[in-house]
Amino acid sequence: NIEVLELAKKHDMVYAAIGFHPTDLDSFDFTFLEEHINDDKVVALGEIGLDYHYDNDIDTKKRQIDPFKKQIELALKYNKPVIIHSRDSIMDTYNVVSSYSNLRGSLHCYSGSLEMAKLFVEKGFLLGVGGVVTFKNAKIVKDVVKNIDLKYLLLETDSPYLAPEPHRGEVNTSTYIPIIAEMVASIKEIDISDVATT
């Protein structure tokens, strides 16, 4: 959080999202967030959310949900969007998110089902689409891209992870966004210029 704030202050075109990732809750500092949420360069709270990939016992779930809710409430208080991390936790994520009205933001690196995607879109959320959409076996993500209106899809990286084909296994960078855009255009059977301008 401190590094991203310093980077944003040094560069005019760089803005910051601050927050505590669900796997970094040992360092959770709500006071820090309150002190910096209104900094000129802070535009969102994130990545925040739930991650049950490595540990899905009841204690882990309980430990992650409260900080997630506190960060959402802070975002609402200061009218900031949220960037949500949801890994192997899509139903709990939706249950938390749907308990708040006027919450806006995106689901980073969306990997849930089409049915869940529709529920999040109904709440006004954007769905992050990254390099995974280019993977041969990414049928669920491709189904989401095909069936969700383009205006709800947000092209992104998960740098340095999940580089698109043919760069899979390499360090991911924002220079690969055009590859993701081409795949989205192909799946939706539209021109890439439509993807670029939506």
Kindly label every feature range from the protein language model:
Residues 1-198:
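Mid-domain alpha/beta scaffold segments of enzyme catalytic cores
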